[in-house]
Each structure stands twice: as structure tokens, then as C-alpha cells.
Amino acid sequence: MAKTLYEKVFDAHVVYEGKNELPILYIDRHLIHEVTSPQAFSGLKMAKRRMARADLTLATIDHDVSTKSIDLNACSDMAKEQITTLMQNTKEFGVRLLGLGDKNQGIVHIVGPELGFTLPGVTLVCGDSHTATHGAFGALAFGIGTSEVEHVMATQTLKQAKLKTMKIECKGQFQKGVYAKDLILYLIAQYGTAKGTGYAIEFCGELIRKLSMEARMTLCNMAIEFGAKVGMIAPDEITFEYIKGKEFAPKGEEFQKYCEYWKSLRSDEGAKYDESITLDVSKIKPQISYGTNPSQVIGIDEKIPKISDFKNQSEQKSLLDALSYVNLEQDQVIEGVKIDIVFIGSCTNGRLEDLKIAADILKGHKIHKNVKALIVPGSMQVRKEAENLGLDKIFIEAGCEWRYAGCSMCLGMNDDKANSGQRVASTSNRNFVGRQGKGSITHLMSPASAAACAIEGVICDNRKYLGV
């Protein structure tokens, strides 16, 4: 029977399936951080259990950490408590920790792939909703709750219902100035934040095969904003080349053997999906969010919708509520809206390729006098590689702040926050009410668009800096 990529990986990991029961999956990889792991470790201690496979768990500090300094004392009291607790727990249970000052510390969904901890065909979980990122490697990756984190620690298994499958085929090529971030924002804008609910989605097509691993991770990262639990891309030579030589990756002849197996991780010809979507990506323009959920997105040259554009009363109310919060009007042109802060980073767009794209636009320019711009590498490895290329000098000379690794302004959980009423051009993944600080306003966009906004001080078209 022909199978999809998702079905192949899922079925290969079923260790038990009782009658009228959910299948039990073996979990190959477990990523943890300081926010969702403390209660799980406490549960193990109360039950006097050890971890089943501490060697298959990797911990990092990312959500709470200050990006202004690698000194623990730079963090808030709550952050210090969570970070210290993770340090103690990982030491007690024998889990490797990428702590403050570690050359590999960074955002969980960036350090996993760059260390080769994420591999094609594995099951990978984390107490974080954006775990779907790792599906870019052909891994079955999804976010779990704290009780499930404890269960994986104790048993290395999870009960999981099998999801429906959706194929998203991407045809054509991007226009100049359009990136993977624009594609996923466009997809969510067209179909809504609930379209993927109950599905494992697979991105495929001629465009996907040409994308870098960084771009593929951006797509799978925001599968969750599309409503899906899982986003996957079949591995190929681009995947294998990315993995080769990384710390946790197979080595030598073993690597070649794995590559042969990984080549089988693609949907069979004739495999049936529960739903399919086909996109012509050549029509996509730089995308900007205008509201308070990731489906409220328009092209840079478009106007904010009017209430008459929606027939559904709940959608009409959502529009009015969003515009009231972000202080914008129906039928308003998005280009030219004043911004206060630019944030380039996060598990969506904090990789080296993202920083290169931003640097190419910022080079030779100064940011607007009324703008504060934070450039936050997603890991200390990304930071080092960027500095080796001189990107830090470009950012600093432009007037940006060059930070240490962490989640930073993606969420108002650390010391990088926007004040009430401040408008942020952000490369993160969520624009919810107060996401980047109480009363803050978020506009999601690509690193190229964010860099252009930093120069002009308003939402603008990045293509003018690319000769388009």
C-alpha cells in the first residue's frame, strides 16, 4: 500500500497498538528548555523514577535568557530560578545542557538541527509548540505538554492519535524580495489559522526542492500557525549535506548507509492525502501582518480589508477588534505605517541565512533615528558564524544592537519587551495581543522586510533595496 512520508515515519515508530486504544510511539529525540521542564522533573522525583534514555534528551536555555549578556545575573529573578532549576535537574539526571556561556547554547529549534540532533525519519518532541520546525528534515516532530514531557522522560514513548494528511504543493519560483516567510504567511492568510487542524502537512513541489534547509525550517516552523500539529518535508541531498559532519550525525560509512535509508523517506507514488493544496508562489509579494493573528496578512502593496470583505460575523468582529488594538483603519494602506522597533531573530528567522539577508539590505545604510533595531542570532553558533562573516559589523555600523542568542522579543517573557503602544516589525511567528509586551503591536514579516523597515522607520517594500 502506498504511504505518505508522515505515514511511513509514524508507522515505523508504533511499538504497541491495543484494540480501541491510541498507538504508542517510540520517541527518538527529546528537546527540553527551562520553561516547560521543571514540573516534569519534579514529577519524576516524586515518583522516584529515573529517565529512560537521558542520552536521547538535549537541554538548552532560550526563553528566559537575557540577550544583552551571558551573565545569569542579567536575567530576572523568575528567569534565574527557572534557569538554575534546569541546571540542577540536568546535572542530577545526566542530561546534556547547553547552558549560558556554552558555545552551542541557543533557541531549542535552532540548536537541535545545527548539532545534527535532528535527523530524517526520527520522532522528535519538545514542550514547545514550534517543534514542527524539525519536520523540515523529514522528522516526525511535534510539541507536547508538560505531563507528556514527564512521560517521555520516564518511558521514551507517547500515545498519539494518527493525524490526517495534507499535501501543500508549491509550484513556480519566488519573485525577488520574496522568501519562505512570505510563503507561509500568504498560505495562512489565504486559508486561515484552523485549516491545518488535525493534519500532518507535507510541503512539496519544485520550489521546495530548491529551498535551503533554513528556508524549509521557516515553513515547517509556522505550520502550527496554520493549525497543523506537524509540518514535514522529504529529505534530499540538500538535507544530507546540511547534516554531514555535525556532532550528533552518523559518521563515515555509517553516514552513507543512513543516506540510503533517508532516501526512502518520501511519499510513495499514488499515496493518498486527505486534502491537497496547490500554490503558485510566483504570484506572492512581500507579506505583512496587520492584525492580531497570523491570518490577518496582506501584500505590501495592498490595503487592510474592510468589514464588507467578510460575510462571517465572527470574522468581521475579529477584524474590528484587531484594528482597534493595533490602531489602524479599514481600507488603510499598510505601507508607510510608522514603526518603533525592529526585531530580527526567533526560531522562525534567527538563522545565519536570515541574518545574511538582513545584512545585505542594511549594508551601507543607517537605521532611522526613531527606530530601535535588535538583531538576535538564534544560537551562539549562528552568532560566531555571523561574526566570522563580518555581519555584526554591518549591523552595528547601521545602528542596530547585536545581541547574544535567545528567544528575545519573540515573546514578552524576558527583558526584551516592547512598551504599550509601540509598533514592532518582527520576524517572529505570532502577532497576538501583547505577545511582545503588554500593549505592544506586532507586524510579522521576513528579515528582508524588517531590515528595510529599520532603515525607513515605516513599513515598506524591501524590493526597493534589491534593485526591483
From Swiss-Prot:
Superkingdom of this protein's organism: Bacteria
Claim: Iron is one of the keywords in the record: yes
The entry's keywords: 4Fe-4S, Amino-acid biosynthesis, Branched-chain amino acid biosynthesis, Iron, Iron-sulfur, Leucine biosynthesis, Lyase, Metal-binding
A GO molecular-function descriptor: metal ion binding
Subunit-structure text: Heterodimer of LeuC and LeuD.
Protein name per its UniProtKB record: 3-isopropylmalate dehydratase large subunit
Gene: leuC
Co-factor: note: Binds 1 [4Fe-4S] cluster per subunit.
Keyword Amino-acid biosynthesis: yes
Listed pathway(s): Amino-acid biosynthesis; L-leucine biosynthesis; L-leucine from 3-methyl-2-oxobutanoate: step 2/4
